[in-house]
């Protein structure tokens, strides 16, 4: 059995240059989400070495580095906490999130699509930023949510998007502006029941646009889908690699949603530029155990 080469590539010089303003944010985020203390990482497996050029980095040096590059290196297999003990990764949290005290609205059967073929859908997908004033139908909203991460094999709990370990850390919050038969407001998608939970009624256009740095597409959309993650669902099992897997899954869910919108003749636009704290506050999330990752605006496209 051949022995693996454990030498790791050296981060670029640019990756180790100061990035003012991001030090505190990235350090706290990676420490909380990654579940380990940056700067105190060392090999867990015999023969493994820290990435060249990073072994001597301490907590005081983090502000002088691209923490994304360091996290990528340190989350490779074989690199974990020093001090002789692994961090406490915690226990597995509940697999689903519900709002038991709010109104629950069953969604229509999502089957029976009259949509483009998969080949046509992939070829036609574009980022669409302008929408008509036409309402989105409840049937289409049901299909979008089911395509994003609805149950596809209920007996085993499998969903439409792949998930590391089938742990499903991603939550979906539709901010509904104009859907036939639905009150405007903040909703939560209960995938197990294929239903919506009305978290708070009201017009969220101003709030989501402010959080989204003034992007007009967020105010025009019939629905803005916000994807969040409950990190512990993945962290307890996959440890320092959990954050990688969570972000990958957000991409899977987002692409499902975009392709479903395109196949239904709708327009969709993905948005990654937003103020995290403002968006988390808008949704009522703490930004630590659960945090917003992604916004996808959907509406009836202009011709």
Residue map of PLM features:
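N-terminal Sec-pathway targeting helices
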Residues: 18-28
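N-terminal amphipathic, basic helical "cap/leader" segment at the start of enzyme domains
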Residues: 2-5, 27-220
């Amino acid at each position: 059995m051949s022995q693996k080469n454990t030498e790791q590539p050296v981060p670029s010089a640019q990756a180790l240059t100061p990035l003012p303003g991001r030090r505190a944010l990235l350090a706290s985020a990676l420490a909380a989400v990654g579940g380990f203390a940056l700067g105190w990482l060392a090999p867990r497996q015999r023969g493994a070495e820290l990435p060249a050029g990073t072994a001597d980095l301490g907590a005081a040096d983090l502000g002088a580095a691209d923490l994304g590059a360091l996290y990528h290196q340190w989350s490779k297999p074989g690199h974990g906490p020093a001090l002789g003990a692994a961090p406490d990764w915690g226990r597995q949290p509940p697999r689903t999130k519900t709002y038991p005290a709010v109104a629950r609205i069953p969604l229509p059967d999502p089957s029976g699509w009259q949509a483009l073929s998969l080949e046509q859908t992939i070829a036609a997908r574009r980022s669409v930023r302008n929408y008509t004033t036409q309402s989105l139908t409840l049937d289409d909203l049901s299909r979008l949510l089911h395509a994003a991460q609805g149950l596809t094999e209920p007996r085993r709990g499998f969903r439409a998007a792949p998930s590391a370990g089938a742990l499903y850390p991603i939550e979906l919050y539709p901010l509904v502006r104009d859907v036939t038969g639905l009150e405007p407001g903040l909703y939560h998608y209960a995938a197990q029941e294929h239903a919506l939970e009305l978290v708070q009624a009201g017009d969220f256009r101003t709030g989501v646009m402010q959080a989204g740095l003034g992007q007009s597409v967020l105010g025009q959309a019939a629905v803005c889908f916000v994807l969040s993650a409950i990190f512990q669902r993945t962290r307890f099992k996959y440890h320092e690699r959990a954050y990688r897997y969570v972000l990958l899954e957000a991409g899977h869910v987002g692409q499902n949603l975009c392709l479903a919108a395109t196949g239904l003749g709708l327009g969709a636009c993905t948005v990654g530029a937003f103020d995290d704290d403002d968006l988390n506050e808008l949704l009522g999330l703490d930004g630590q155990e659960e945090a917003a990752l992604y916004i996808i605006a959907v509406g009836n496209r202009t011709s």
